[in-house]
Structures are given as structure tokens and as C-alpha cells.
């Protein structure tokens, strides 16, 4: 049986991750730590012999620059890349820019956990006049009004990510291409829920660490066989726990 591998990687720590702020579609860059995480991810992949034929990422620079860091370490900076808004982070609506711990102090840990991790729960909406509304950003000029979010749940994020997976990414994998995807916590959670057929309760507890390669292996029918992170297991567990704790009051 031939095994097809796919590598998913959440962007390295961003400036707003470092400040513990809701980011969503806000286009913040990587922190110094995030740049280092991207390079380290590339080094881990190189040490394990990974080579890629094609890459996907979002239209947000924290994911794009993570991919650059990885590919630079692999000496594959030339690799063809497709950028899509469908791989963007979940849109956090009116929470974007707010400190997560301060928001938890105001609304309670459980409410913020539901906003962050609940499957069908949307954060408070933006108005379309708000400067944070993506309709004001030229990179989304080709999107229809219906495609421009004022807030998103994970369920709504899945609604845009999985068609892109089925129509664009999966056909390349079926043709034998080796794929890496640099994306975001919730766009990756959307793919993981779909690939592993997780329940709404299971996905609530899933936290994706920053800057750590997540490998999926598929059988001949493109069904997932197993998945695993590359790197030090204790460090990865600590990173995932840190993500979970971001939304708690101090």
C-alpha cells in the first residue's frame, strides 16, 4: 500500500498571539519567536527527509511568512504556492483586537471558551462599516458580499475550508504531489475535524500548537490512516496547553 503524506502547520507565534489578542482576519506578522518556530519547523522537516511539490497558504502574512521560513530551511523557496482566503483564520468578529484574558475577566472563562472553541457559536458581529470588516480590504475585492464574514463559528469556517480541500487540495494529492499547508489554528481544526470525523465535543478540546508540523498519512483511497506531530513531544504538549490557556482570566 502506497502512503501519501500531507503536512499541516499552524503559523508561528504572531505579534498578537504574544499579546494574547483575538486576531482572526487581522493581518499581523510573526513575532521573533514565531520566525524562529518557522525555521525550526523547516529544520525538523529537513532532518526527516521531507520534500514538497506544492504549497498552500492563506492570504494572511503570518501564515505566508511561516511557509517562507519552512521552505527556506528546506531550500525549496522556489516551490509553487497557492494563497486562498478560504484557508484564513476564523473571523472573530467584534472580538478582533481584544485581549483574551481581559475578555474572559469581563464575560467569564466559559463564555470565552465557547466563543473560541464552540462549534456553532459565533462571536459578536462586526458591522459592515467597521474598519475591521474585510470588505474594506483590497485583497478580498473579488469576494461576493455573501462570502465576506462579519463573524464566524468553526462550523462556518468548515463551510469554506472543506470545499477548498475537496476541490483543490485533494486532487493534487491524488495525482501524487507532496503537499504542505501553512494555515491557522481554526482552519487547521476545520480540516482535522473533517479528516478524523471528530464530534463537536471532541473538536472543542482540540488545540493546535504554533509552528509544529502535523503529518497526516493517507491510504490509496485517500482515507487518513494516522497523524502525528514532528518534534519533541513534551514541548508540543506544552505549546498546545498554552493555546488552551490563552482564553482564561488571569
UniProtKB/Swiss-Prot annotation:
EC number of the protein: 5.4.2.11
Record-linked NCBIfam families: pgm_1, PRK14115.1
Residues that bind substrate: 10-17, 23-24, 62, 89-92, 100, 116-117, 185-186
Pfam families hit by this protein: His_Phos_1
Name under which the protein is recorded: 2,3-bisphosphoglycerate-dependent phosphoglycerate mutase
Source organism of this protein record: Sodalis glossinidius (strain morsitans)
Pathway noted in the entry: Carbohydrate degradation; glycolysis; pyruvate from D-glyceraldehyde 3-phosphate: step 3/5
Subunit text: Homodimer.
Positions of the record's site feature: Transition state stabilizer: 184
